[in-house]
Amino acid sequence: EDIWKKFELLPTPPLSPSRAALPGDPGELGAVAGDCSLMGFGLTDPLDWASELLLLPGDDIWGASDGDLFGSVLDTTDNSIIIQDCMWSGFSA
């Protein structure tokens, strides 16, 4: 007996193509002249757009390396160091 039929679950959908619909790609499926694509990516489904963001390297999304994400500790005031420490600590009330 097939377990999927018993629970009436659908199989997992295929993964979205990685960066296949970014502007400038010759094989771009969603780039037709005058189409209403989401933010110029050629992706009409918001879930596809979100999937593409998850696949981008961190520098492409944030524009900074991991070490520069919160700035240098030397350039901050004592108050901001305390805020960062409280934000990222594992303590919960």
From Swiss-Prot:
InterPro entries, sorted: Myc_transcription_factors, Tscrpt_reg_Myc_N
Expression sites by tissue: Barely detectable in most tissues assayed.
Compartments where found: Nucleus
Main location: nucleus
Any one annotated GO CC term: nucleus
Gene Ontology MF terms in the entry: DNA binding; DNA-binding transcription factor activity
Function, as annotated: May function as a transcription factor.
Subunit composition and interactions: Efficient DNA binding requires dimerization with another bHLH protein. Binds DNA as a heterodimer with MAX.
Protein name: N-myc protein
Species in which this protein is naturally found: Danio rerio (Zebrafish)
Gene: mycn
